Amino acid sequence: MQSMVILGATGSIGASTLSVIASNPETYSVYALVANTNVDKMMALCEQYRPKVAHMVDEQAAKSLQERLSPSLKIEVTTGESQLESIVTSSCVDTVMAAIVGAAGLVPTLAAVKAGKRVLLANKESLVMSGRLFIEEMKKSGAQVLPVDSEHNAIFQALPEPVQQEIGFCDLDEAGISHILLTGSGGPFLTSPLSSLPQMTPAQACKHPNWSMGRKISVDSASMMNKGLEYIEARWLFNASAEQLKVVIHPQSVIHSMVQYRDGSVIAQLGNPDMRTPIAHCMSYPQRINSGVEPLDFFKVGQLSFLEPDFTRFPCLALAIDACNQGQEATTILNAANEISVAAFLDNKIKFTDIAKVNETCLSQVAKQALNSIDDILALDVQTRTYASEWVNKI
């Protein structure tokens, strides 16, 4: 029986993970559920999955949950950073699903890595913000990190087994790999007139044509910043150079990514757009379990198409690739700026096209500094958020 902690239990990845657990009750148990403020959802999850611990990041939410949970469930309710670190590093825990969205997921995810846990990485911001430090800690502790994002999971599955065992410090060239082809649907605005983009609403941006996701990642998909963050994540996970990474627009979201080999072969991973597939793969690796996802029906798929990315339409993608080439300081700044600008857009404070403007301004104006520790990273994150918030208020 594999004991799991779900970071971000009330989010979409958390829900998909718990669905896979429910389909395989003889193999997995829930040690702890972690969420931010959603007490109602956490109540329902506690009653269904009976974890040993329920942790709320928000202190008031923890108090409310404690008052509402039946004592007969015998679930310990906790809050606070030190308590969260104790949960992910507990000897009772085998696997940590790292699915807290944004920079908030960095500290607990890194704590799990340092503790040598099996970490299922859905929080791409951890690598975007702390890439080199993250990989160094992973190598030092011997933690097994498996990529949950559908694209990175697809790449992982298309790699030779020896390369899979060297995530973070593999040699793609030695393995005969010429390119990693990172696919993306292009989101809901792929064919919208460029002149209409400033008028796009949060509701329109969140209406992804293929995937069901949270609001923040949906907006990132509309701007293709999500693909940009995945580009940065792929650089660290697969130790890839800029020459080895390519982004391919694939509107149908059937091919989740590809690996191109020196001999001309291209290996792709295909499947229905359902996050339970990569989650189940990571949970059971190197075995296979039932994910609950319907098999792909090739007769219904029809045509598969591919396009080069249009950087005029998707300036956030260009910013992310450029930041990746600049280095760790730039990607940390970009991530912080993007979280502020997307939140402002979702609150109807700025236009959709202002997201890229805020991000670009922060990249050019926030002073870059050496990042030698997690404290340095968090300090730059706070500094950038302050600058981005001030800039948002000027728009």
Curated annotation (Swiss-Prot):
Q: What class of enzyme is it?
A: oxidoreductase
What this protein is called in its record is 1-deoxy-D-xylulose 5-phosphate reductoisomerase
SUPFAM superfamilies registered for this protein in UniProt: 1-deoxy-D-xylulose-5-phosphate reductoisomerase, C-terminal domain, Glyceraldehyde-3-phosphate dehydrogenase-like, C-terminal domain, NAD(P)-binding Rossmann-fold domains
Q: Its gene? A: dxr
User: Which reaction does this enzyme catalyse, per its entry?
Assistant: 2-C-methyl-D-erythritol 4-phosphate + NADP(+) = 1-deoxy-D-xylulose 5-phosphate + NADPH + H(+)
Record keywords: NADP included?
yes
Residues annotated for NADPH binding in this entry: T10, G11, S12, I13, N38, N123, E125, G214
For activity, the cofactor(s) needed are: Mg(2+); Mn(2+)
Residues that, per the record, bind 1-deoxy-D-xylulose 5-phosphate: K124, S150, E151, S185, H208, S221, N226, K227, E230
Task: Extract one GO molecular function annotation from the record.
Answer: manganese ion binding
Q: Where does the signal peptide begin and end?
A: none
Under Pfam families, the record lists: DXP_redisom_C (PF08436), DXP_reductoisom (PF02670), DXPR_C (PF13288)
Family the entry assigns: Belongs to the DXR family.
Its function, per the record, reads: Catalyzes the NADPH-dependent rearrangement and reduction of 1-deoxy-D-xylulose-5-phosphate (DXP) to 2-C-methyl-D-erythritol 4-phosphate (MEP).
Q: Name the pathway it acts in.
A: Isoprenoid biosynthesis; isopentenyl diphosphate biosynthesis via DXP pathway; isopentenyl diphosphate from 1-deoxy-D-xylulose 5-phosphate: step 1/6
Keywords, in A-Z order: Isoprene biosynthesis, Manganese, Metal-binding, NADP, Oxidoreductase
Q: Name one GO biological process term.
A: isopentenyl diphosphate biosynthetic process, methylerythritol 4-phosphate pathway involved in terpenoid biosynthetic process
Q: Where does Mn(2+) bind?
A: D149, E151, E230
What EC identifiers does the entry list?
A: 1.1.1.267
